[in-house]
């Protein structure tokens, strides 16, 4: 019996070729676009965000060319609750979030899977550069890096559950981006040469602080820049304007370069220091998801990424509680930022990950 699949179609070249490859493999496919956010800025020239009206039309065009049914699922409320609210709350509490991880976690691989099941489909498929396999010994599904190291997206997929992995396919996992564009051109897809989306869809101009102030109705109060000893160095514009490791835009004159090293929410102070003050020997993460196992029974040695484009770093990871891991780096790491994801790897296999906690908060978890 022909297996059915819903293809998550963003209107970009990757998801379009994913749809083509699924049809070529013999799946009974339908395309689906999640309507997440309406922002007039997203349609402006120069912005490279997803979820624009033209993206929907591009997806519809490709689906028609492949002879597939095509759906648009409005999910504005779910997106607002699961992604934007969390994004704003994390910034207001001193962190720097990655909303694309939450969009994948709660919408693309959760809400869309629910829709697929309602339509009688066994699988969803996406244009992410990642691979998924089943361990023959344990029966668990594992997540692996895409073979193209320049496009691998496994970092933003670490939160996928066993159920989601069991019902998700990644047709592009063994391809390079160059090969994908070549296939799209061969098939005459309207979006074959379309640039990749890079901006956050609901903040296409990159001005996170203004968006959060407008979205929440809360202004970020100015306060003091201080050094490690508490000496006042100047005035900041509001904490949401700054992230750990930031050097530019501080407006502080000093003999040596200063960086944002921390924030004190209680006193509304932003702490500045030198490069050496950005280094961390360990961090703690919560909201964890482990893929090959349910729990770490003993410390493990692995590689860790604390930012999307960061090279993996050797570390030891141990589980301290049901929802708490401690990561100890072999070498101190620069600008380990609360709110970002720390993702664990063993070779090309994703072991899991979680959200980096502010210093001093782990003991309260």
PLM regions: where:
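ATP-dependent adenylation/nucleotidyltransferase module used to activate substrates
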Residues: 1-158, 169, 179, 185
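AMP-forming adenylation/ATP pyrophosphatase catalytic core
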Residues: 125-132, 136-365
């Amino acid at each position: 019996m022909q297996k059915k699949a819903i293809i998550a179609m963003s209107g970009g070249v990757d998801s379009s070729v994913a749809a083509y490859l699924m049809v070529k493999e013999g799946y009974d496919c339908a395309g689906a676009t999640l309507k997440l956010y309406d922002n007039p800025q997203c349609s402006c020239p120069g912005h490279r965000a997803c979820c624009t009206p033209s993206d929907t039309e591009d997806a519809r065009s490709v689906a028609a060319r492949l002879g597939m049914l095509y759906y648009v699922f409005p999910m504005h409320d779910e997106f607002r609750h699961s992604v934007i609210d969390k994004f704003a709350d994390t910034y207001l509490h001193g962190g720097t979030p990655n909303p694309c991880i939450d969009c994948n976690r709660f919408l693309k691989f959760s809400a869309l899977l629910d829709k697929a099941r309602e339509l009688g489909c066994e699988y969803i498929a996406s244009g992410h550069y990642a691979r998924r396999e089943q361990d023959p010994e344990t029966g668990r599904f594992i997540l692996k890096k895409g073979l193209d190291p320049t496009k691998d997206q496994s970092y933003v997929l670490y939160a996928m559950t066993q159920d989601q992995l069991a019902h998700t396919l990644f047709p592009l996992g063994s391809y390079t981006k160059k090969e994908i564009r070549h296939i799209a051109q061969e098939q005459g897809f309207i979006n074959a040469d379309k640039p990749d989306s890079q901006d956050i869809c609901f903040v296409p101009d990159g001005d996170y602080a203004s968006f959060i102030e407008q979205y929440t109705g809360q202004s970020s109060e100015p306060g003091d820049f201080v050094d490690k000893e508490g000496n006042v160095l100047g005035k900041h514009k509001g904490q949401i304007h700054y992230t750990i490791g930031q050097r530019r835009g501080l407006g502080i004159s000093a003999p040596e370069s200063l960086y944002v090293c921390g924030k004190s929410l209680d006193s509304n102070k932003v702490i500045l220091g030198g490069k050496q003050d950005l280094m961390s020997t360990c961090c703690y993460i919560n909201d964890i998801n482990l893929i090959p196992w349910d729990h770490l029974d003993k410390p493990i040695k692995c590689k860790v990424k604390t930012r999307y484009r960061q090279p993996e770093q050797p570390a030891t990871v141990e589980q301290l509680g049901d929802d708490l891991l401690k990561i100890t780096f072999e070498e101190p790491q620069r600008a380990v930022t609360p709110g970002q994801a720390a993702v664990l790897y063993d070779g090309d296999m994703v072991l899991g990950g979680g959200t980096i906690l502010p210093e001093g908060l782990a003991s309260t978890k």
